[in-house]
Amino acid sequence: MDVLSVSEINAQIKALLEATFLQVRVQGEVSNLTIHKVSGHAYFSLKDSQSVIKCVLFKGNANRLKFALKEGQEVVVFGGISVYVPRGDYQINCFEIEPKDIGSLTLALEQLKEKLRLKGYFDEENKLPKPHFPKRVAVITSQNSAAWADMKKIASKRWPMCELVCINTLMQGEGCVQSVVESIVYADSFHDTKNAFDAIVVARGGGSMEDLYSFNDEKIADALYLAKTFSMSAIGHESDFLLSDLVADLRASTPSNAMEILLPSSDEWLQRLDGFNVKLHRSFKTLLHQKKAHLEHLVASLKRLSFENKHHLNALKLEKLKIALENKTLEFLRFKKTLLEKISTQTLTSPFLQTKTERLNRLENALKLAHANLKLPQFGALVSKNNQAIELEALKRGDKIELSNEKTRASAEILSVDRV
């Protein structure tokens, strides 16, 4: 048996292993994952409960992965055994990697969803509100598609006042993602201008999952999320649920359904307006009746106040005339009394003069009583005792008195007198 050097034996092992294990599929758990920042190569180990084997995924193959390779993942790698002669190491040179039990596209989509969820792409507080009465809507679709024809037909029936603008876009196949992104950005560029769109609708009819999968792309999700214009995703059928549906401000199950959700029904609004008109007429009629009644009440109150004010002024004038008459009468009586006092005592004792004096005193008392009545307030009463006017200060407990005004007389008894 020939003696071999270390290099020779490693070289023979390399030739044997690489020829024997040219293509292998190996299942295991990813561990010790390292991605080289400069080269982009990924180095990791694949292990099960008993063994470990080293693996390498070079940059070119890594870029073709549909999902992100992570520590602890259960995967199936496809590749070939390679031996590094200087160290006698062997490893699997991975050409493809798929997650165990689920497809790589499915895993990639779930990973992307989680990434976007953490960035807030699905949060309701980041969604823009649906416009109530859209005037101008951008539809991102193929201008020759059945979806566009259906959308125009429904829009013309529901809300013909709305202008529907088709932005012709490639909706499947190679170049679809870039075309959709460019159309979204273009439509949104009119934001805050006189030609701004009230809504952007990304729409296409049904198809295979391969046809629709472009709308799970992160670039389309970014374009929808960053748009300042309200957006809708209307891709495929009710059963098709794509990433664009989660990111857009609103999802419609089909392109036709998008028009039914976005555009109000002119027939329904005409019925509503008729109802509003009836309610408005009733409310106005009721309000007019209330205001009319209130006005009539105010007019009546004004007339009553005017009459009372006029009556009060006349009463004041009469009061002034009565006071003037009283003063003149008192002045005359004083003059007569003074004149009589000048007559001698003997003359006063004469029956004739005595009679005249008594009559004069009666007249004076009557005048005082009339004076008290004249000074009676509008809402007051004359106080008298034994048919003689009496001041309040002269009253005492137990006195029987009479209260009177122009319309009423009443009797009363003094229960107590408080001096102020």
Swiss-Prot record:
<protein>
    <recommendedName>
        <fullName>Exodeoxyribonuclease 7 large subunit</fullName>
        <ecNumber>3.1.11.6</ecNumber>
    </recommendedName>
</protein>
<keyword id="KW-0378">Hydrolase</keyword>
<dbReference type="Pfam" id="PF02601">
    <property type="entry name" value="Exonuc_VII_L"/>
</dbReference>
<dbReference type="GO" id="GO:0009318">
    <property type="term" value="C:exodeoxyribonuclease VII complex"/>
</dbReference>
<comment type="subunit">
    <text>Heterooligomer composed of large and small subunits.</text>
</comment>
<keyword id="KW-0540">Nuclease</keyword>
<comment type="function">
    <text>Bidirectionally degrades single-stranded DNA into large acid-insoluble oligonucleotides, which are then degraded further into small acid-soluble oligonucleotides.</text>
</comment>
<dbReference type="InterPro" id="IPR025824">
    <property type="entry name" value="OB-fold_nuc-bd_dom"/>
</dbReference>
<dbReference type="GO" id="GO:0005737">
    <property type="term" value="C:cytoplasm"/>
</dbReference>
<dbReference type="GO" id="GO:0003676">
    <property type="term" value="F:nucleic acid binding"/>
</dbReference>
<keyword id="KW-0963">Cytoplasm</keyword>
<dbReference type="GO" id="GO:0008855">
    <property type="term" value="F:exodeoxyribonuclease VII activity"/>
</dbReference>
<dbReference type="InterPro" id="IPR020579">
    <property type="entry name" value="Exonuc_VII_lsu_C"/>
</dbReference>
<dbReference type="Pfam" id="PF13742">
    <property type="entry name" value="tRNA_anti_2"/>
</dbReference>
<dbReference type="InterPro" id="IPR003753">
    <property type="entry name" value="Exonuc_VII_L"/>
</dbReference>
<comment type="similarity">
    <text>Belongs to the XseA family.</text>
</comment>
<dbReference type="GO" id="GO:0006308">
    <property type="term" value="P:DNA catabolic process"/>
</dbReference>
<keyword id="KW-0269">Exonuclease</keyword>
